[in-house]
């Protein structure tokens, strides 16, 4: 396509609008400031639940959760009668089986869980003869088979033609450092920067999805207003692309650039165990599961889901009304007949069919065939503990329908 510029999508995980705007204005993130000055800026809205696998699947497919079928960081697989855990924490991964969790996060999310008819941007572009590239993107399904760099860890996968995934999959030899050698100091973003520099130097793609997760990692630990050092590292990673092209002007002459986050973050002040509100039901246990279980609970960060199992002798409304009494929960959502119902403090909220705000996002989330029968959005300052009992109190989290998330 003569005259068509190539495109780079940069996603800085967990970067909030307030932090971005302050960094751009103060120029503490000079590359981001330069891009903001050269382009246009607007605030965007994440999907619900506003969690990385869900949001990145939406970015990769252009579809809402009811289209791509990724419902949460953790969910109950009705067909396989087990819990899928993509990595809420190491404790949560151990609770379901660490090897199984690694396989789900790296392989099965793309090979099996992502809807077959939700075409990814990599698939669409390469079907048209263009070269797609992805760096560290968890949602990567493409047309090209890739073998892992470490045999036996996971099986081969199908990704874009140029595919780099945390040193585990590398379509090309770039000389980039190991991605997992010091996460708190930005090792993953440093790996992405080295790979991105290599790609831009060779002009080796028509589309690049460039994903930087280290800011989110720091923000979980330090809070959204305390991760300035991590943002500076993310800025340098984007700067590596700019430098490889010969400076900002040359970079923007060659590429169109979209820079965004996948979701926001808000401060966490208290944990809440969703299972505690349902203790008089028989609950499914990820290890040592019980065949007489009535409910399965999937919770992490600031969103949760409850599944009614075949043994349950209760309607979704009864469970939802129980949950809506909890001060730790802001909104509880469920289906009744063909209607989507939302409860807040026991009162029913209207969900009009044409609402494009939080109500529309809630409907799309509940319509996902892998979602629970009841969805919950945590109240401000509350985080739902994961299967390992972990939370981010004192730091930041996300997942809810509230604006900051």
Question: What is each PLM-predicted segment?
Answer:
Residues 24-27, 148-152, 223-228, 271-278, ...:
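Short secondary-structure boundary/capping segments
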Residues 9-12, 45, 134-138, 211-212, ...:
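Glycine-rich, histidine-containing beta strand-loop boundary motifs that form or position
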Residues 63-224, 327, 331, 339-351, ...:
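His/Asp/Glu-rich, glycine-adjacent segments
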Residues 117-118, 291-405:
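Active-site neighborhoods of enzymes that stabilize oxyanions during catalysis
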């Amino acid at each position: 396509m003569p005259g068509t510029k190539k495109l780079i999508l940069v996603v800085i995980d967990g970067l909030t609008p307030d932090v971005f705007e302050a960094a751009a204005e103060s120029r503490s993130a000079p590359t981001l400031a330069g891009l903001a000055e050269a382009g246009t800026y607007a605030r965007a809205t994440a999907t619900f639940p506003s969690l990385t696998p869900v949001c990145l699947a939406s970015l990769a497919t252009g579809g809402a959760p009811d289209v791509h079928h990724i419902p949460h960081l953790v969910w109950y697989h009705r067909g396989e009668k087990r819990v899928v855990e993509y990595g809420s924490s190491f404790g949560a991964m151990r609770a379901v089986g660490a090897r199984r969790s690694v396989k789900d996060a790296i392989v099965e999310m793309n090979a099996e869980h992502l809807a077959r008819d939700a075409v990814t941007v990599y698939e669409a572009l390469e079907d048209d003869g263009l070269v797609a590239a992805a760096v560290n993107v968890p949602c990567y399904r493409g047309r090209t088979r890739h073998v892992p760099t470490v045999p036996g860890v996971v099986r081969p996968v199908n990704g874009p033609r140029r595919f780099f995934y945390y040193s585990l999959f590398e379509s090309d030899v770039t000389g980039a450092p190991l991605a997992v050698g010091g996460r708190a100091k930005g090792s993953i973003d440093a790996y992405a920067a080295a790979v991105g520099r290599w790609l831009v130097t060779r002009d080796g793609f028509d589309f690049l999805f460039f994903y930087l997760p280290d800011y989110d990692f720091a923000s979980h630990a330090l809070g959204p207003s305390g991760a300035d050092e991590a943002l500076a590292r993310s800025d340098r990673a984007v700067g590596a692309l700019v430098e490889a092209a010969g400076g900002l002007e040359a970079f923007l002459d060659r590429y169109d650039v979209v820079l965004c986050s996948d979701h926001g973050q808000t401060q966490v002040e208290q944990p809440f165990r969703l299972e505690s509100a349902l203790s008089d039901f028989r609950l499914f246990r990820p290890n040592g599961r019980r065949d007489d279980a009535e409910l399965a609970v999937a919770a992490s960060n600031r969103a949760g889901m409850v599944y009614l199992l075949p043994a349950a002798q209760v309607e979704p409304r009864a469970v939802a009304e129980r949950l809506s009494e909890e001060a730790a929960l802001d909104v509880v959502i469920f289906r009744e007949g063909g209607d989507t119902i939302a409860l807040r403090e026991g009162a029913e909220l209207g969900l009009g069919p044409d609402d494009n705000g939080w109500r529309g996002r809630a409907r799309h989330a509940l319509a996902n065939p892998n979602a629970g029968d009841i969805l919950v959005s945590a109240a401000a300052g509350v985080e739902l503990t994961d299967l390992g009992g972990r939370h981010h109190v004192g730091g930041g989290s996300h997942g809810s329908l509230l604006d900051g998330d």
